Amino acid sequence: MFVSVFTKEPWCDDWSDPEQLDLYIQDLTGQGYSLTYGLFDDEDELIGISLGYIKHWYSGTEYIINELCIRTDRQGAGAGTFFIREIEKAVRELGLKQIFLLTDPNVPACEFYRKNGFTECTSNVAFAKSIE
């Protein structure tokens, strides 16, 4: 499901290398601090995933979401909002104080997060540098 969502618009990620994909998913799920959630429909089909980890920070423990997606054919029908609410309940029960994530400001997911109560962290900026 991850590949089918993120290789389409608006992301168009190239996950054609299965070894790189396996390593990435292992990075996200194979650590002691990993925290993964799945959303299943009434037929027990996986329709959403959240891949992240627990981070201990001075202001409290957080859930950092690295990847969150809803199956493409289920987007726009409330599944994502339901999933976010369920994740909020679950991490609250764990005693976590915040959910943090990054997204591209030019994709529909950005507005989705705003509509679901996330606020932009304007005091931070992300940097990257290619070293090839």
Give residue spans per PLM region.
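Conserved beta-strand in the GNAT
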Residues: T36-G38, E45-I54, I64, C69
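Conserved beta-strand-loop-alpha-helix junction that forms the acyl-donor binding cleft
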Residues: Q75, F100-C110, A128-E132
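A short helix-loop-beta-strand connector motif used in the catalytic cores of GNAT acetyltransferases and
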Residues: Q26-G38
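Conserved acetyl-CoA-binding loop of GNAT-fold acetyltransferases
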Residues: P105, R114-S123
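Conserved GNAT acetyl-CoA-binding A-motif
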Residues: I84, V91-D104
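Conserved acetyl-CoA-binding loop-helix of GNAT-fold acetyltransferases
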Residues: I70, G76-K89, R114-K115
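A conserved beta-turn-beta hairpin within the catalytic core of GNAT-like acetyltransferases
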Residues: E45, K55-I65, Q75, C121-S123
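Conserved GNAT-fold acetyl-CoA-binding loop/helix
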Residues: V3-I25
